[in-house]
Amino acid sequence: MGKYFGTDGVRGEANLELTPELAFKLGRFGGYVLSQHETEAPKVFVGRDTRISGEMLESALVAGLLSVGIHVYKLGVLATPAVAYLVETEGASAGVMISASHNPALDNGIKFFGGDGFKLDDEKEAEIEALLDAEEDTLPRPSAEGLGILVDYPEGLRKYEGYLVSTGTPLDGMKVALDTANGAASTSARQIFADLGAQLTVIGETPDGLNINLNVGSTHPEALQEMVKESGSAIGLAFDGDSDRLIAVDENGDIVDGDKIMYIIGKYLSEKGQLAQNTIVTTVMSNLGFHKALNREGINKAVTAVGDRYVVEEMRKSGYNLGGEQSGHVILMDYNTTGDGQLSAVQLTKIMKETGKSLSELAAEVTIYPQKLVNIRVENAMKEKAMEVPAIKAIIEKMEEEMAGNGRILVRPSGTEPLLRVMAEAPTTEEVDYYVDTITDVVRAEIGID
């Protein structure tokens, strides 16, 4: 991570950390870096979610892009993966999404996609950061016909909706409950599932600029769980603020998380011979029950660090076509270059229709082990060295011996905060509590600063 770019673009509290001034510079410098090798006038797509700060930042960002001669196609409110899809399929130089995903309304972010539809690599981000930190702005300042042109492009959203519908199957009156998180999916999810023939109940579809992710969406699925039961829906589908995640709810109101969604889609593709190298890419946070279910089905797995960018890197490097995270980021590389909650939802309902199975039946094949995660505040300098402390190393080894292969312990530093994360999984909550509490007691005694 750099000075400005984190694991998912530039983020911060809007108008305080992520200011219009910074947005202008990101547009100007980012647009230049991503289009300097173009032979024709560069074209960049810009989308945003429903945050009150979105239009402010969009105006500044667009001004920066136009100032270096880039033609900007303004997409309005739509999902992050829609920007990636349109960049790749319509030959744009780049795409930019203004969103802070599942964060509250006071935050916002700016995320770039290259001309291939993928998020920027570290080298491109470093080029942009170098320009941001330069003492003087020496980039070209064209005038008159050299300036960029601004185009409103609402057709982009319709094209994305049509594409997702084309990947699904008719749902013939299936009762579907949607929670669009008062976010980006509020402009598209209803239309997509109506076009597929579903009978819909929708919540979280009245954005006011301040209520994005507020007690709704994939991080707060409780309202959707109740709605599914009340409406008798076959499935509930909860997206986050920019709709790159999906958490599902079965007909009984039970959560079906990213691990289970990946398993269901992965098994379906594997049985059809369409799962590349018969492998799913996942992260170290995926549940042990998910791993055991894959082993039972003979499906391979590749494990990465936490973060969808690392999942995508591994998929691209090794040619895999399915990967994701427990949090609901699911990447279906045959269809799009990034996590796409609405695409995952369309595929999940297609599998239900084709197999004739309920979501609870499909999800029951994965027995999720109870999991507990505790964050311990430590000095930044110590979080990377925790495993070198003899007492900590010894207690982890002792707990792993007691588990005897029927559980899992993961101790890792936070990538952004002075925290050490201690996680355990085991067959019962009592065992999980015992393992985590025993380890955290030792960690706190040795290096904790609480």
Swiss-Prot record:
It catalyses: alpha-D-glucosamine 1-phosphate = D-glucosamine 6-phosphate. Its EC number is 5.4.2.10. The keyword Magnesium applies. The active site is at 101 (phosphoserine intermediate). Pfam families: PGM_PMM_I, PGM_PMM_II, PGM_PMM_III, PGM_PMM_IV. The modification Phosphoserine is found at residue 101. GO terms for biological process: carbohydrate metabolic process; peptidoglycan biosynthetic process; UDP-N-acetylglucosamine biosynthetic process. Its cofactor is Mg(2+). Mg(2+) binds at residues 101, 240, 242, 244. Signal peptide: none annotated. Binds 1 Mg(2+) ion per subunit. GO terms for molecular function: magnesium ion binding; phosphoglucosamine mutase activity; phosphomannomutase activity. GO terms for cellular component: cytosol. Activated by phosphorylation. It comes from the Bacteria. Catalyzes the conversion of glucosamine-6-phosphate to glucosamine-1-phosphate. PANTHER family: PHOSPHOGLUCOMUTASE (ALPHA-D-GLUCOSE-1,6-BISPHOSPHATE-DEPENDENT), PHOSPHOHEXOSE MUTASE. Belongs to the phosphohexose mutase family. This is Phosphoglucosamine mutase. It comes from Streptococcus pneumoniae (strain ATCC 700669 / Spain 23F-1). The gene is glmM.
